[in-house]
Amino acid sequence: MGHRITTQSRGHGGPTYRAPSHRYKAALKHLGRAGETVSYKIIDIEHDPARHTPIALVDVPDGENTYVLVTEGMGIGDVLTWGADAEIRNGNTLPLQEIPTGSSVCNIEAYPNDGGKFVRASGVQATVTDKMEGRVAVRMPSGSTKWFNGQCRATIGIVAGGGRSEKPFVKAGKKYHKMKNTASNWPRVRGFAMNVIDHPFGGGGHQHAGRPKTVSRGTSPGRKVGHIAARRTGRR
């Protein structure tokens, strides 16, 4: 069969195909618990290999300093507040039921006190659109509307780092370093372009499969490439 093909190596789970989570700085969560109001000062803004948005290091007087998500307009020295009594201001975090309709929000909790799950990517925002009987409707970046428990917390503002994807990589080396921080297999080489020992479709005087590209569901792992258990192939 030749060498172990890429899909088999990925399934084995070596470090090449795993995200380097040992380099990630922190899992960004909302601070404080339900019913309490806390304020912390931003002492630094840093880059985290785990994400494309900057993160803020905040000073926690009675514990270890921790990181939070940065919204557009934040700066070193700003004081951020978490709690129902917080001011309606960029960067502050409140329960959704306390945030006015029409406000831009990010880092929304799926359930109260889970720390934040939705709208965390660079440059994205959601909008509070409606409130009804303890539930709040939010228009997500995808355009769909999702209802949340009114006690779920969210940060007011737009996630920092917008426009990141508009800047070209220019050099393959920069793309390489970006992809090394993820679990992605990059660059991805086509099976046709490989040597015959590296892939069932490899080898030959020109790039072609040289064998049927449809395989059964129970095919052995080294041959299970192409159209797997396909009902049909080709154009309709």
UniProtKB/Swiss-Prot annotation:
Biased composition (Basic residues): 224-236
GO CC annotation terms, alphabetical: cytosolic large ribosomal subunit
Record-level Gene Ontology MF annotations: rRNA binding; structural constituent of ribosome
SMART domains registered for this protein in UniProt: Ribosomal_L2 (SM01383), Ribosomal_L2_C (SM01382)
Entry keyword Cell cycle: no
InterPro entries: NA-bd_OB-fold (IPR012340), Rib_uL2_dom2 (IPR014722), Ribosomal_uL2 (IPR002171), Ribosomal_uL2_arc_euk (IPR023672), Ribosomal_uL2_C (IPR022669), Ribosomal_uL2_dom3 (IPR014726), Ribosomal_uL2_RNA-bd_dom (IPR022666), Translation_prot_SH3-like_sf (IPR008991)
Region (Disordered): 1-20, 202-236
Domain of life: Archaea
Coiled-coil spans in chain: none
Record-level GO BP terms: cytoplasmic translation
UniProtKB keywords: Ribonucleoprotein, Ribosomal protein, RNA-binding, rRNA-binding
Biased composition (Polar residues): 1-10
PANTHER family per UniProt: LARGE RIBOSOMAL SUBUNIT PROTEIN UL2, RIBOSOMAL PROTEIN L2
Family from the record: Belongs to the universal ribosomal protein uL2 family.
General function of this protein: One of the primary rRNA binding proteins. Required for association of the 30S and 50S subunits to form the 70S ribosome, for tRNA binding and peptide bond formation. It has been suggested to have peptidyltransferase activity; this is somewhat controversial. Makes several contacts with the 16S rRNA in the 70S ribosome.
Assembly and oligomerization: Part of the 50S ribosomal subunit. Forms a bridge to the 30S subunit in the 70S ribosome.
Protein name: Large ribosomal subunit protein uL2
Lineage: Archaea, Methanobacteriati, Methanobacteriota, Stenosarchaea group, Methanomicrobia
Gene: rpl2
